[in-house]
Amino acid sequence: MSEESNEETKIIELEDIPGVGPETARKLREAGYSTIEAVAVASPSELANVGGITEGNAVKIIQAARKLANIGGFESGDKVLERRRSVKKITTGSKDLDELLGGGVETQAITEFFGEFGSGKTQICHQLAVNVQLPEDEGGLEGSVIIIDTENTFRPERIIQMAEAKGLDGNEVLKNIYVAQAYNSNHQMLLVDNAKELAEKLKKEGRPVRLIIVDSLMSHFRAEYVGRGTLADRQQKLNRHLHDLMKFGELYNAAIVVTNQVMARPDVLFGDPTKPVGGHIVAHTATFRIYLKKGKDDLRIARLIDSPHLPEGEAIFRVTERGIEDAEEKDKKKRKK
């Protein structure tokens, strides 16, 4: 038994990757590659940016790390199903919204909530930051949270309010939420790298990160890249950012939640002209896309518009002082009519 434990410990050390000595391991850790999984999912060009590693050596190091971490290559469908069993779900606070999402917000997936101002995007983020800390039998994952705040919308007072409604100590809940304000798109991307270092530290302390939130995803990208001439550069940068988030989710079995802004399509004459910003890059990378709309008073309507395995559908929920809650039956019936 002890030999197996030693072997597992060896596997997670960077120095055990063929071609990686103590000095290279030190440089990798300083660059944010603190585990063999992080090395295994890196690209050769990314690793070549670490001092002293050529692109040729980077390819060899990545291949060796993939073998040790058992990442890459083909696997049978039943093995994929077995791996899918490690996926967890976080309750939103509303049974109907959870049902729409197939049981809650999934780990190892990007869930995008988009809608107009006041549609409930940030409220859902705050609620998830509380709920992820609940025990598993109550819909949580007993995990920590990282929030990348691009619009200065995080409010600790709201967290305390929602936590106390769940019977939790608000100040204790806040201790497990790590917030960083992103000042531009480069800083936003850098914070994902910093999040990996923080996640490693918290993992060792027995407080694993189970949720990373970006509220909002496109705010800085839209402000900095104006006009059609900059669109290609913006989309390339955005693509890398989303893939970095996805890697984080897979490495730490964390849910990735992003909020997104909307724009009106002038070419749509009938129906709802609203669409999320970010183009095809966001559309293809987000696993679940939920369109949020304002209803009467505290009611909000969530429409699932894209998912790999769930049908399109709608759910009605309420945003109250206590947080995200189910709508009353009479409100649901009115919507169906």
From Swiss-Prot:
Which HAMAP family does its entry note? RadA_arch (MF_00348)
Give the UniProt family note.
Answer: Belongs to the eukaryotic RecA-like protein family.
* GO terms for MF: ATP binding; ATP hydrolysis activity; ATP-dependent DNA damage sensor activity; damaged DNA binding
What stretch or stretches form a coiled coil here?
none
NCBIfam families given in the database record? PRK04301.1, recomb_radA
Q: Which organism is it from?
A: Archaeoglobus fulgidus (strain ATCC 49558 / DSM 4304 / JCM 9628 / NBRC 100126 / VC-16)
Name it.
DNA repair and recombination protein RadA
Encoding gene (name): radA
Keyword RNA-binding listed? The answer is: no
The UniProt record lists the keyword ATP-binding: yes
Q: Which residues bind ATP?
A: G115, E116, F117, G118, S119, G120, K121, T122
